[in-house]
Amino acid sequence: MSQIRAFLAIDLDDDLKPKIHKIIKEFKQIDADIKYVDLQNLHFTLKFFGDIDTDGIDLISSKIENVIKDFDSFNIKIKGCGAFPNTNRIKVIWVGLDEDEILKNLHDRLDKEFNSIGFDLDKKYSSHLTIGRMKSAKGKADVKKTMETNKTVDIGTMEVNTIILKKSTLTPSGPIYEDLIEYRL
């Protein structure tokens, strides 16, 4: 029995990536210790499973299908820039979403289904697109200023019509993602 590191995600539309790239370029002008996410890896995580047995993929897949049958495609508005856990202790730099009830409902329904097969419930779901991770406090003041400048930046709207079960392989140069199964809404 083998294991993979897996998560369920929504990929960012390609036509919105140039706007995200523009924001990343602003951060790159700062002398800060930030590891940036590759544009092709940008996604919204719906559920991080961690290491799972490959035998369990069919069960996870059936739970996903059980939930998404009740959902049609929907639009999300991508906007704003911030940090986790907060702007005083920056670990993750993100681009956010206008709070979306359909996306929250989709997440909550999936979370309950996964909990029924032994996965922990998410503590608090905050949909975001990680664009970078701060490795040290170097340049923090300028990072905060750039975040403030982009606090309400409007990236655009995209249709969510697919969610994807992905495999993540960690490497020294960063994670490599592989799409395992696509689910159409």
Regions found by a protein language model. Give the residues of each.
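Histidine-dependent nucleotide/RNA phosphoesterase domain, centered on the 2H-phosphoesterase fold
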Residues: M1-L185
